[in-house]
């Protein structure tokens, strides 16, 4: 009897044959599972790690957040610890410098004895911002009616520019008496002639001198003398007394009153001896 026949005879008389076959099958299954698992690991090792996985892994390593440590803390302590460990990059920075590279500086032009000043808003403003810019310029120009802008002090504050100056009010009762002469015997009066100023008595109506010319003497090079009269500022006697019911101390005082009434006093006193 050959060996195969002997094996069959032995197996036929083996009491634990079923159990042995089951153990053999389970052993074979475990061997195949281990083989497939080892094969999968080897295949994964040959493939490069995806870029998104690398970025996520590196970003986690950049933070000080320690999940293992936080699990040991109370809920309140976890919140405090988490706030302490927030990355600096998450903080919002509002201090962003803004520059207008295409901004055009103001341009002063002169044509035929007239001057013009062109102002240009910064490029890139919205429609609302442009309107706000225009209203700011208009407000500055409007303020020149009440003071001399050239005499104002500019305060450069942290959040604004502030102009400070002496307010000019057209108060007729406080008109400054002229120290310059006005001579009645001459048809032309000067604001810079020697002698005491002409005092007007109660019987003399200053408006009777409405057509009398008064010469304003220039005090700046390049500015010519100018002659003015009351009718340059007032259209009628009623208008004259409606502006200043108390009248003026002299003819030059009335001229100064007219300059203030027309909002020209600040400009005139910069150019002429009043």
Curated annotation (Swiss-Prot):
- Which residue stretches belong to region Oligomerization? 104-165
Coiled coil ranges: none
A single Gene Ontology CC annotation of this entry is: virion component
Record's keyword terms, sorted: Chaperone, Host cytoplasm, Phosphoprotein, Viral RNA replication, Virion
| Substitution effect: residue 262 to A | No effect on the binding of P to N-RNA. Loss of in vitro transcription and binding to L but no effect on RNA replication or on binding to soluble N
Residue numbers bearing the Phosphoserine modification: 59, 61, 236, 242
Description of post-translational modifications: Phosphorylated in the N-terminus by host CK2. Phosphorylation of the phosphoprotein is required for the transcriptional function of the P-L complex.
Q: What are the disulphide bonds in this sequence?
A: none
- Marked site positions, Involved in oligomerization: 133, 136
Comp. bias intervals (Polar residues): 171-193
Which parts of the sequence are annotated with region: Interaction with the L polymerase?
Answer: 49-101
Q: Where is this region: Hinge?
A: 166-202
Described purpose of this protein according to its UniProt entry: Nonenzymatic cofactor regulating the function and conformation of the RNA polymerase and part of the transcription and replication complex. Binds the viral ribonucleocapsid and positions the L polymerase on the template. Acts as a chaperone for newly synthesized free N protein, so-called N(0). Plays a role in virion assembly.
Q: What is known of its domains?
A: The N-terminus is disordered and is involved in binding N(0). The region of interaction with the L polymerase is necessary for transcription. The hinge region is highly variable. The central domain is involved in oligomerization. The C-terminus is basic and essential for binding the N-RNA template.
Q: How does it assemble?
A: Homodimer. Interacts with the L polymerase; the association of P and L forms the polymerase complex and positions P optimally for encapsidation of newly synthesized genomes with the nucleoprotein. Interacts (via N-terminus) with N(0). Interacts (via C-terminus) with N in ribonucleocapsid (via C-terminus); this interaction allows to package the L polymerase in the virion and positions the polymerase on the template, since P acts as a bridge between N and L.
Q: Supply the name of the protein.
A: Phosphoprotein
Gene (UniProt): P
């Amino acid at each position: 009897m050959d060996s195969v026949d002997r094996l069959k005879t032995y197996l036929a008389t083996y009491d634990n044959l079923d159990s042995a076959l089951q153990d053999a099958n389970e052993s074979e299954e475990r061997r195949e599972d281990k083989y497939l698992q080892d094969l999968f690991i080897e295949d994964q090792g040959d493939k490069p790690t995806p870029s998104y996985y690398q970025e996520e892994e590196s970003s986690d390593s950049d933070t000080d957040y320690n999940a293992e440590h936080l699990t040991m803390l109370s809920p309140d302590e976890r919140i405090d610890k988490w706030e302490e460990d927030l990355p600096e990059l998450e903080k919002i920075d509002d201090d962003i410098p803004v520059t207008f590279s295409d901004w055009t500086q103001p341009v002063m032009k002169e044509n035929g004895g007239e001057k013009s000043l062109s102002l240009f808003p910064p490029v890139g403003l919205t429609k609302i911002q442009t309107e706000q810019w225009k209203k700011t310029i208009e407000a500055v120009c409007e303020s020149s009616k009440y003071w001399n802008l050239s005499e104002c002090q500019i305060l450069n504050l942290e959040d604004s520019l502030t102009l400070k100056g002496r307010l000019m009010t057209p108060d007729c009762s406080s008109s400054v008496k002229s120290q310059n002469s006005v001579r009645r015997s001459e048809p032309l009066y000067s604001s810079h002639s020697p002698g005491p100023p002409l005092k007007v008595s109660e019987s003399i109506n200053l408006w009777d001198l409405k057509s009398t010319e008064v010469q304003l003497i220039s005090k700046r090079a390049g500015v010519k003398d100018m002659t003015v009269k009351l009718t340059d500022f007032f259209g009628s006697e009623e208008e004259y007394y409606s502006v200043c019911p108390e009248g003026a101390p002299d003819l030059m005082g009335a001229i100064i009153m007219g300059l203030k009434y027309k909002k020209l006093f600040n400009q005139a006193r910069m150019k002429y001896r009043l």
